[in-house]
């Protein structure tokens, strides 16, 4: 699937890759935060010792930074997008629409949803961009 990046997203990815020595495959900029999809296996490099690289990136951008690890499957990607919530299982159902059903620990549903639904909406947008998933439902 081809992902279209805005000029701002391309610039933010360039800053990310310079600051972290990790590779980002997607970026969702917002007024107060930037969400990066990091190549699978590069999260440690992106975070840095004790979060040092993320802290430096946040200082450079003046916004909070959220990292999501890429995954080869829709199920893995949805689980990563809902992190740090404990996701036990993800099932993708394809009928008229494609829906990912994520089994999340009861005590982590608030984390998966986020303040004002921010986390779940971001996960839905990323899942749509990367795997043509129309919706994510928490179970």
From Swiss-Prot:
GO terms for cellular component: cytosol. This is Probable transcription termination protein NusA. GO terms for molecular function: RNA binding. Residues 31-97 form the KH domain. Keywords: Cytoplasm, RNA-binding, Transcription, Transcription regulation, Transcription termination. CDD domains: KH-II_NusA_arch_rpt1, KH-II_NusA_arch_rpt2. Its main location: cytoplasm. It comes from Halobacterium salinarum (strain ATCC 700922 / JCM 11081 / NRC-1) (Halobacterium halobium). InterPro entries: KH_dom-like_a/b, KH_dom_NusA-like, KH_sf_prok-type, NusA_arc, NusA_bac. It holds the Pfam family KH_5. Participates in transcription termination. It comes from the Archaea. Belongs to the NusA family.
